[in-house]
Swiss-Prot record:
Catalytic activity of the protein: N-methylanthraniloyl-CoA + 3 malonyl-CoA + 3 H(+) = 1,3-dihydroxy-N-methylacridone + 3 CO2 + 4 CoA + H2O
InterPro entries: Chalcone/stilbene_synt_C, Chalcone/stilbene_synt_N, Chalcone/stilbene_synthase_AS, Polyketide_synthase_type-III, Thiolase-like
UniProt keyword Acyltransferase present: yes
Enzyme class: transferase
Record key words, sorted: Acyltransferase, Flavonoid biosynthesis, Transferase
Record note on quaternary structure: Homodimer.
Pfam families: Chal_sti_synt_C, Chal_sti_synt_N
Family per record: Belongs to the thiolase-like superfamily. Chalcone/stilbene synthases family.
Name of the protein in its database record: Acridone synthase 2
Enzyme Commission number: 2.3.1.159
Gene3D superfamilies (UniProt xref): 3.40.47.10
């Protein structure tokens, strides 16, 4: 028994897991939000739905988004008219794009993260790949392993259909892997596409327009590991704790269902209110051990699910106007990229902290929170510790 305890102790890291590198990538196709209503109703042959188009214009104007990136080109949509219908039988065409583009964009982000990390890719011991697009076997984790030329013995974990909260999920899983497998280095990739969800408008599904106004494509990658080798590696943030919570009275608030017509997404109007009404519970539980209860004293990396969610969080917690700056910037420049979005926010925060001459990667603050929100309704709460900025 004593030798078993010694073995177990030897397997664990000395310190907490740290984020050692971040990389991001987007498709080449860029859509300016101000022009998108005209494009969307034209490409879907829905210009006769003038009242619905006016509603969509209002959604886009209030979205906080300046531009988005999407893998679907105008040429592809013209060649696949079933994708442009509201409920056209189009799963095969969507899959053909998703199973190729999901690992491809993920690879672009991963290459950037590995380059920043500084170690050879052969030192990657674990891979976590997360997406809500392109379910396939073998999965995107396998495809990425081959594309990057990772060690064939890399321990892979494939996560499908988690949605927007999974940017927090992957950090929670990576933390557990890094801290319980001494010397391990975990490559985390979230790659999300609108290929399954893009569809034309319908007067009978106004909630679908919300997703069409907000969702976008993008991939983010991290390298996570404990006990950094300071001769090569540098921690960007330490992952102090991670937890998950289902919000009360939220059944059916966000749902997604795979059909012959693709992935149909359903959003209830009270989603922002449900999140804001319950956000203080996971916050209090996460920061009680640190004695922190002033939410303006920490840095914020919140999933920018939509402008209403961010606005109501600010009001509920009494946050200063600049607290959600990083989330709003990512929303403006990229839209809602599901699980990868909050990792873009993380990258934005560390970059802006350096540009502005802040003392830490957390905008000069030591402690912070990363929030993922999504179907369930599920909230992932990750407590982060920033590090001093090195010019």
């Amino acid at each position: 028994m004593e030798s078993l305890k010694e073995m177990r102790k030897a397997q664990k890291s000395e310190g907490p897991a740290a984020i050692l590198a971040i990389g991001t990538a987007t498709p080449d196709n860029v859509y300016i939000q101000a022009d998108y209503p005209d494009y969307y109703f034209k490409i879907t042959k829905s210009e006769h739905m003038t009242e619905l188009k006016d509603k969509f214009k209002t959604l886009c104007e209030k979205s906080m988004i300046r531009k988005r990136h999407m893998c679907f080109s105008q040429e592809f949509l013209k060649a696949n008219p079933e994708v442009c219908k509201h409920m056209g039988k189009s799963l095969n065409a969507r899959q053909d794009i998703a199973v190729v583009e999901t690992p491809r964009i993920g690879k672009e982000a991963a290459v950037k993260a590995i380059k920043e990390w500084g170690h050879p890719k052969s030192s990657i011991t674990h891979l976590i790949f997360c997406t809500s697009a392109g379910v396939d076997m073998p999965g995107a984790d396998y495809q990425l392993t081959r594309m990057l030329g990772l060690n064939p013995s890399v321990k892979r974990m494939m996560i499908y259909q988690q949605g927007c909260y999974a940017g927090g999920t992957v950090l929670r899983l990576a933390k557990d892997l890094a801290e319980n497998n001494k010397g391990s280095r975990v490559l985390v990739v979230c790659s999300e596409l609108t290929a399954p969800t893009f569809r034309g408008p319908s007067p009978d599904a106004v909630d679908s327009l919300v997703g069409q106004a907000l969702f976008a494509d993008g991939a983010a990658a991290l390298v996570v590991g404990a006990d950094p080798d300071t001769s090569v590696e540098r921690a960007l943030y330490y992952i102090v704790s991670a937890s998950q919570m289902l919000l009360p009275d939220s059944d059916g608030a966000i749902e997604g269902h795979i059909r012959e017509e693709g992935l149909t997404v359903h959003l209830k109007k009270d989603v922002p209110a449900l999140f804001s009404a319950n956000i203080d519970t996971p916050l209090v539980e996460a920061f009680r051990p640190l004695g922190i209860s002033d939410w303006n004293s920490i840095f914020w990396i919140a999933h920018p699910g939509g402008p209403a969610i961010l606005d109501q969080i600010e009001v509920k917690l009494g946050l200063k106007e600049d607290k959600l700056r990083a989330s709003k910037h990512v929303m403006s420049e990229y839209g809602n990229m599901s699980s990868s979005c909050v990792l873009f926010v993380l990258d934005e925060m560390r970059n802006k902290s350096l540009q502005d001459g802040k003392s830490t990667t957390g905008e000069g603050l030591d402690w912070g929170v990363l929030f993922g929100f999504g179907p369930g309704l599920t909230v992932e709460t990750v407590v982060l510790r920033s590090v001093p900025v090195e010019a």
